[in-house]
Amino acid sequence: MPISKIHARSVYDSRGNPTVEVDVVTETGLHRAIVPSGASTGQHEAHELRDGDKSKWLGKGVLTAVKNVNETIGPAVIKENLDVKEQSKIDEFLNKLDGTPNKSNLGANAILGVSLAIAKAGAAEKGVPLYAHISDLAGTKKPYVLPVPFQNVLNGGSHAGGRLAFQEFMIVPDTASSFSEGLRQGAEVYHKLKALAKKKYGQSAGNVGDEGGVAPDIQTAEEALDLITEAIEQAGYTGKIHIAMDVASSEFYKPEEKKYDLDFKNPDSDPSKWLTYEQLADLYKSLAAKYPIVSIEDPFAEDDWEAWSYFYKTSDFQIVGDDLTVTNPLRIKKAIELKSCNALLLKVNQIGTLTESIQAAKDSYADGWGVMVSHRSGETEDVTIADISVGLRSGQIKTGAPARSERLAKLNQILRIEEELGENAVYAGQNFRKSVNL
């Protein structure tokens, strides 16, 4: 079925920054996708095209990317008369049209918007939900797997004020019997945590960060973990809800000294207190021994390969590569060869097409890795990643706290999918690292 129209416009993300929205029109109707954007972005990511005109949107406009869709990509795709169900051919065509390895010509934000909107058109033409279409494209087996929601309930690092260096502390309801029960448990812990934060750190500690987590003026990781552990206990889930961290350590790595500065938000940080990767690895291990930590993301900087391999050899929890791998096939291949981590954080806008995202997941699965599908800190009401997570059987999704509508939109979509699938789906639960084999 031919595409009759492709139209892009500039809309806003959850941080008030412009982003690209794409409409694709076929005989089945209008199919729309909105592209997210990140705050702490890896330098090896596909290129997000921003206008750079400081007089508008502080340089963050996306009018060039929108124009690229409306004047270059759209007309070329329509002229090519591609079948919307053949996602890999469409994405290959988009990449050829751009002609650069990192999509810097037309912009990954322009290309991804078109790729995802066409995927929705493909699902509609087949008369199936988007997750089912993605499952077909990826060749995943049945039953469907509903992911464990990794809920970012406490923010530090680049996402928050206080001195806390680590970026995200997540609760993991992996012993729940279903997705909906896991989400309920998470919401209950979140409310206890909010009340505790206000009580201990004052009323403003209940204010939420970019991803819905609280951001009290916390100094250390121990302090954050104690607060979360107490909230879990108050909610009655001790031993049932686990914890995950996203350290985002590239943000506080000192490449000259090859050290990590846990006081990086302090301009007068004392260099004698900066840590070597071995010292930082020991800190993680001591935290994992004391708290119920099941997953650590980006424990080391994106090009500190030696540190990753060192840590991997001696750890038994999930080690997730985000800035390290940036959903990029070449980086994933290198991480597999060097035995750097055992799970991929999958962000569709890091690579820029649905087909390449599916391939990144398959490459990771092939080496026994886990895959966690992720939002970005600048999100929208678009729920595509919920369908991607179910379609790929990823077993884990990270989409913020159970707060702020752009975060809940994804979680609510999985609730709908759970209801629709009924007995034809299983909850990943404690098998979240191996859910592709369930």
UniProtKB/Swiss-Prot annotation:
Positions bound to substrate: 159, 168, 297, 322, 374-377, 398
Q: Which GO terms describe its molecular function?
A: magnesium ion binding; phosphopyruvate hydratase activity
Sorted alphabetically, which keywords does the UniProt record give?
Answer: Cytoplasm, Glycolysis, Lyase, Magnesium, Metal-binding, Stress response
Subcellular location, principal: cytoplasm
EC number(s) given by UniProt: 4.2.1.11
Induction per UniProt is: Down-regulated when grown with elevated levels of potassium chloride.
Output the Gene Ontology cellular-component terms: phosphopyruvate hydratase complex
Q: Where is the active site?
A: 211, 347
Presence of keyword Lyase: yes
Q: Where does Mg(2+) bind?
A: 246, 297, 322
Cofactor(s) required, per the database record:
Mg(2+)
Instruction: Tell me which PROSITE patterns the record gives.
Output: ENOLASE (PS00164)
Which pathway does the UniProt entry assign to this protein? Carbohydrate degradation; glycolysis; pyruvate from D-glyceraldehyde 3-phosphate: step 4/5
Say if the entry is tagged with keyword Lyase.
Answer: yes
Enzyme class, first EC level, given as a word: lyase
Catalytic activity reads: (2R)-2-phosphoglycerate = phosphoenolpyruvate + H2O
Where does the UniProt annotation locate this protein?
Cytoplasm
According to the record, cofactor stoichiometry and binding are noted as: Mg(2+) is required for catalysis and for stabilizing the dimer.
The Gene Ontology biological process annotation of the record reads:
carbon utilization; cellular response to farnesol; cellular response to osmotic stress; glycolytic process
Which Cys residues form disulphide pairs?
none
Q: What does the UniProt record say this protein does?
A: Involved in osmoadaptation.
Q: Which NCBIfam families match?
A: eno
Which PANTHER family does the UniProt record give? ENOLASE
Q: What does the subunit section of this Swiss-Prot or TrEMBL entry state?
A: Homodimer.
Family to which the UniProt record says this protein belongs: Belongs to the enolase family.
**The name this protein goes by in its record:** Enolase
Which species expresses this protein natively? Answer: Emericella nidulans (strain FGSC A4 / ATCC 38163 / CBS 112.46 / NRRL 194 / M139) (Aspergillus nidulans)
Q: What is the lineage of its organism?
A: Eukaryota, Fungi, Dikarya, Ascomycota, Pezizomycotina
